[in-house]
Amino acid sequence: MIRIQLNIELNYEIDQFGADFVFNIHAAHTASQQISSENLFLSQAIDPQIYTDPVNGNRYMRLRAWPGPLKVQYSATVDLTHHFSNPAQVPEVPVRNLPPEVMGYIYPSRYCQSDRLLKLANSTFGGQWQGYSRVEAIREWVQRHVTFTSNSSNTNTSAVDTLIERVGICRDFAHLMIALCRALNIPA
């Protein structure tokens, strides 16, 4: 088990019109993540609405802030338990057998345009042994073909941008690997 302590403090100055917020700062409720303690402080007398996504356990807090200062403080102690498998024994699951809850992770997204990487993914990795070794080959390929360079991307940088520019930061490496996996129908 791994224990993590989170402490978040956000400070805002709200104009005379007030403001609506949606925060994603709460620790998620999942089978492998137990929240042993948590505390939320709002400097304004606000009754927030907290929604838990039934699929992934992520929690969102919505609130309407009044004019003036707003301080949001959240702290939590979270205990994580992970399932470990021997990577060599992790099979690749055909699309027809994928659990419904992971189907969304094979589709293209704003940052992971897997539909634009189909030809590259299939020509480079399509003939490889399916399963962990194929995912590991994708990781190695990205590591060989993309250079880590601080400040080389921004919030609009996508997997295709990273592939073209061949530079990026951690997030960009992840987006390119995710897009290549999705292009091969490997949920990521």
Model-derived features: where do they sit?
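Intrinsically disordered, low-complexity N-terminal segments that are enriched in acidic
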Residues: M1-P87, P91
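Catalytic nucleophile-His microenvironment captured as a short glycine-rich beta-strand/loop
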Residues: L10, I178-C181
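Short secondary-structure junctions
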Residues: S32-Q34, L184-P187
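Secondary-structure boundary elements
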Residues: V78-H82, A88, P100-G168, L176, ...
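A charged helix-plus-loop insertion that forms the helical arch/lid used to bind
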Residues: N97
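Functionally critical, mid-to-C-terminal surface segments that flank or help form catalytic/ligand
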Residues: R171-I178, A188
